[in-house]
């Protein structure tokens, strides 16, 4: 029996390691556009958006002042429930909840990004979060609020918090967010498949071990 059981040992170990690797690989990945070494909230009244009131299914132009110390600008739009909404057009990198635009030239003074608001008419307030990132991966964050009423957008200083409620840190900071309905649906779809594979691996492992 020992002779017959010994060839099965590598297979048992392989299945055990496979189960652990699969479980680790199924965890959610952070938003790659939102990993910074430092985040500071500021009041930047020079950031402009046009049009100045919120309407559904409308293209907005966000103008962000930049200089030769800025490497990129990360844009993010959320509704009053902090769910990511809309679509950032022609971004250099689209991430889980945000979009990244590279500063193409050191002589560039204004970076423009276009955002398409969702078709839903149930949204009254939108926050456009702007992260201006330098070459040290340190970001300054500003929030521009668009309202459906006839009021002008109010650029406000708002603390962009992480899981540990830390704004400024020496370690890489990952900005967390709620996902869209599409991302939620993908996770709901993947969850039964992931559970089924884990159960199958556990079943095969138990059969080989016992």
Curated annotation (Swiss-Prot):
Q: For this UniProt entry, which residues form the secretion signal?
A: 1-26
Where is this gene product found? Answer: Membrane; Apical cell membrane
The protein, known as:
Placenta-expressed transcript 1 protein
Stretches of the chain found on the membrane's Cytoplasmic side: 210
| UniProt-listed GO biological process terms | cell differentiation; negative regulation of cell-matrix adhesion; positive regulation of cell migration; wound healing, spreading of epidermal cells
Quick check: keyword Membrane in the entry?
yes
Specify one Pfam family: Reeler
Q: Matching PANTHER family, A to Z?
A: PLACENTA-EXPRESSED TRANSCRIPT 1 PROTEIN
Query: Glycosylated residues?
Result: 67, 94
Membrane-crossing ranges are 190-209
The main location is membrane
């Amino acid at each position: 029996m020992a002779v017959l059981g010994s060839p099965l040992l590598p297979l048992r170990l392989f299945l055990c390691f496979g189960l652990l690797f699969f479980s680790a690989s199924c965890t959610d990945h952070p938003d790659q556009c939102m990993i910074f070494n430092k985040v500071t909230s500021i009041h930047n009244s020079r950031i402009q958006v046009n049009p100045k009131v919120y309407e559904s299914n409308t293209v907005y132009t966000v103008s962000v002042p930049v200089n030769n110390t800025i490497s990129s600008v990360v844009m993010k739009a959320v509704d009053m429930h902090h769910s990511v909404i809309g679509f950032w057009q022609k971004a250099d990198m689209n991430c889980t909840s945000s979009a990244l635009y590279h500063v193409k030239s050191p002589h560039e003074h204004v970076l423009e990004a276009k955002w398409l608001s969702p078709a839903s008419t149930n949204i009254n307030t939108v926050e456009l979060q702007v992260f201006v990132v330098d070459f040290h991966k340190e970001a300054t964050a500003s929030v521009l609020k668009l309202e459906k009423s006839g009021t002008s957008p109010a650029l406000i200083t708002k603390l962009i918090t992480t899981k540990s409620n830390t704004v400024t840190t020496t370690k890489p900071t990952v900005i967390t967010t709620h996902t869209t309905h599409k991302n939620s649906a993908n996770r709901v779809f993947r969850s039964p498949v992931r559970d089924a594979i884990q159960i199958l691996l556990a079943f095969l492992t138990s059969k080989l071990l016992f």
